């Protein structure tokens, strides 16, 4: 059994597709099909076997699971999370990060004072966006780049941004 600390979320089932038990898989890997090169598991650490049927223009994967043959069976998979073992991931280059390692990191200002935490990392197609939850419980979305985040470590990020009063 694997703890969630040893697992990295790499995809989620968005919906059913067609009548043969196919599902729409939103992959968090780049490229999207890279998810299929990993040994995939569920939250309990049990192996998951997925077969690619096709990929749509949005980069979402249309897949099937070995034991799912009908739309009714596939309906229960909506929101199903797919993981891989952290130990199976490749080493990253400098200035590369896994989303799981950045989420919940403290956000510090230029004076190294904690002002919030990274709540989420989003991507709507034009680059990564960092959602920050500030100490006053408000949130803001900022582009994930060196201008806004000049220093990123495994323990915190520095934010170069002045909030409006």
Curated annotation (Swiss-Prot):
Keywords: Chaperone, Cytoplasm, Ribosome biogenesis, rRNA processing
Domain of life: Bacteria
Cellular component terms (Gene Ontology): cytoplasm; ribosome
Localisation: Cytoplasm
One of the protein's GO biological processes: rRNA processing
Database matches in InterPro entries: PRC-brl_dom (IPR027275), PRC_barrel-like_sf (IPR011033), RimM (IPR011961), RimM_N (IPR002676), RimM_N_sf (IPR036976), Transl_B-barrel_sf (IPR009000)
Occurrences of domain PRC barrel (ranges): 94-165
Single annotated GO MF: ribosome binding
Subunit structure as annotated in this protein's UniProt entry: Binds ribosomal protein uS19.
Function: An accessory protein needed during the final step in the assembly of 30S ribosomal subunit, possibly for assembly of the head region. Essential for efficient processing of 16S rRNA. May be needed both before and after RbfA during the maturation of 16S rRNA. It has affinity for free ribosomal 30S subunits but not for 70S ribosomes.
NCBIfam families in the cross-refs: 16S_RimM (TIGR02273)
Family, as annotated: Belongs to the RimM family.
Free-text comment on this protein's domains from its UniProt entry: The PRC barrel domain binds ribosomal protein uS19.
Record's protein name: Ribosome maturation factor RimM
């Amino acid at each position: 059994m694997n703890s969630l600390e040893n697992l990295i979320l790499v995809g989620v089932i968005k919906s059913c597709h067609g009548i043969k038990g196919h599902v729409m898989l939103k992959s968090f890997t780049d490229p999207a099909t890279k998810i299929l090169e990993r040994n995939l598991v569920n939250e309990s650490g049990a192996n998951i076997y997925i077969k690619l049927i096709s990929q749509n223009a949005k980069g979402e994967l249309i897949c099937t699971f070995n034991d799912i043959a009908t739309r009714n069976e596939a309906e229960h998979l909506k929101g199903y999370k797919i993981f891989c073992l952290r130990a199976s991931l490749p080493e990253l280059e400098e200035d590369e990060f896994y989303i799981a390692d950045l989420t919940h990191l403290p956000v510090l200002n230029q004076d190294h004072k904690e002002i919030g935490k990274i709540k989420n990392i989003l991507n709507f197609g034009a680059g990564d966006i960092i959602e920050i939850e500030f100490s006053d419980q408000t949130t803001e979305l900022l582009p994930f780049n060196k201008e806004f985040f000049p220093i990123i470590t495994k323990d915190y990020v520095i934010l170069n941004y002045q909030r409006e009063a």
